[in-house]
Each structure stands twice: as structure tokens, then as C-alpha cells.
Swiss-Prot record:
<keyword id="KW-0997">Cell inner membrane</keyword>
<dbReference type="Pfam" id="PF11909">
    <property type="entry name" value="NdhN"/>
</dbReference>
<keyword id="KW-0521">NADP</keyword>
<comment type="similarity">
    <text>Belongs to the complex I NdhN subunit family.</text>
</comment>
<keyword id="KW-1278">Translocase</keyword>
<dbReference type="GO" id="GO:0048038">
    <property type="term" value="F:quinone binding"/>
</dbReference>
<keyword id="KW-0874">Quinone</keyword>
<keyword id="KW-0618">Plastoquinone</keyword>
<comment type="function">
    <text>NDH-1 shuttles electrons from an unknown electron donor, via FMN and iron-sulfur (Fe-S) centers, to quinones in the respiratory and/or the photosynthetic chain. The immediate electron acceptor for the enzyme in this species is believed to be plastoquinone. Couples the redox reaction to proton translocation, and thus conserves the redox energy in a proton gradient. Cyanobacterial NDH-1 also plays a role in inorganic carbon-concentration.</text>
</comment>
<protein>
    <recommendedName>
        <fullName>NAD(P)H-quinone oxidoreductase subunit N</fullName>
        <ecNumber>7.1.1.-</ecNumber>
    </recommendedName>
</protein>
<keyword id="KW-1003">Cell membrane</keyword>
<keyword id="KW-0813">Transport</keyword>
<dbReference type="GO" id="GO:0005886">
    <property type="term" value="C:plasma membrane"/>
</dbReference>
<comment type="subunit">
    <text>NDH-1 can be composed of about 15 different subunits; different subcomplexes with different compositions have been identified which probably have different functions.</text>
</comment>
<dbReference type="GO" id="GO:0016655">
    <property type="term" value="F:oxidoreductase activity, acting on NAD(P)H, quinone or similar compound as acceptor"/>
</dbReference>
<keyword id="KW-0520">NAD</keyword>
<keyword id="KW-0472">Membrane</keyword>
Length: 159
């Protein structure tokens, strides 16, 4: 019943947790819509946000931090080529205005990521200043979140 699912929090606890922990694991209702309130709240206090999907990323640390090759479909008519693209985070961080509080990388469909990939996302904000990472790792009836490091350790234990 998402229409009756009232959020008692106005987003301030979420923003405080994002600023404190820098990487957050999020569970949102599968119908969607509620997480947009939290994205709007982050943008309202000065963060820039970018939403990407976890499906098809490949090596996440290489995709975000290093130059990586992309092979377009050739359909048998052309030769096989590889285009080199710059790191995604470099593109976003270079265009970040000086007045911005930081940059939030919001990753949807994070349930397809392995524990190793989630662990690499935990350390990402320490490597890149002004970066916050939010990963939607599953769905739940109500929206809830916890530090990504804590969520990864619980997933590793099987809880």
C-alpha cells in the first residue's frame, strides 16, 4: 500500500547519514517514487546527483576511476573496434561547480552487484573527495537505509 505509506521523516535523518557515512545501502518499495523525495532533499542542500544502473557496468572501479574500452556492436559488416572512454567520475567531478556541496552517485538495481563490487563502492568516497555513494540493494515495504559497510558485512554473514 504505497499510497498509505507515510514517511514520518522529512529526509533530514537520511541526509545526516549520507554526510556521516558517505556510502549508504538503501531498500526502497518496488513501486518506486519515495526515493525521489530523498534525491530532491539532497539536491536542495547543494549536492549534485547522478543516477546510474548497476546492470551492465562490468568492473565498477575501472568504469568509475579509470579509462575503459567500449566495443560497439559490429553486426558483421564492419571491423571490430574499441573506443576508449574517460572515467565516469572524472566527467562528473570536473563539471561540479565550486559552490556544490558534493556529488552523489545513486546506483539503482544494486542487488545484481557482488559482495566484492559492493566492498569496492564502500571505499570509493575515501578515494574521491566530495563523493557520496548510495546503492539501492533491494526492495522492502518501507524505505530504509544503513551504512553500506554494515550492509555488506551482514550480507557476507548471510543475514
Amino acid at each position: 500500500m504505497p499510497l498509505l505509506n507515510l514517511v514520518l521523516d522529512n529526509g533530514s535523518r537520511f541526509v545526516a547519514d549520507v554526510e556521516k557515512h558517505s556510502s549508504i545501502a538503501l531498500w526502497a518499495p518496488p513501486e518506486g517514487g519515495i526515493e525521489g523525495n530523498y534525491q530532491r532533499r539532497l539536491r536542495g542542500i547543494g549536492y549534485r546527483t547522478q543516477i546510474i544502473t548497476a546492470k551492465g557496468l562490468g568492473d565498477i572501479s575501472r568504469f568509475l576511476l579509470e579509462s575503459h574500452g567500449v566495443r560497439p556492436a559490429h553486426l558483421g559488416k564492419k571491423d571490430k573496434r574499441v573506443f576508449t572512454l574517460p572515467p565516469e567520475l572524472a566527467i562528473y567531478m570536473d563539471t561540479l561547480p565550486a559552490s556544490a556541496k558534493g556529488f552523489v552517485l545513486w546506483i539503482i538495481e544494486g542487488k545484481v552487484l557482488s559482495l566484492f563490487e559492493l566492498e569496492s563502492l564502500v571505499g570509493l568516497p575515501a578515494a574521491v573527495p566530495k563523493l557520496k555513494v548510495i546503492v539501492e540493494v533491494g526492495s522492502d515495504y518501507n524505505i530504509r537505509w544503513m551504512p553500506l559497510e554494515q550492509a555488506v558485512s551482514k550480507m557476507a554473514e548471510g543475514r
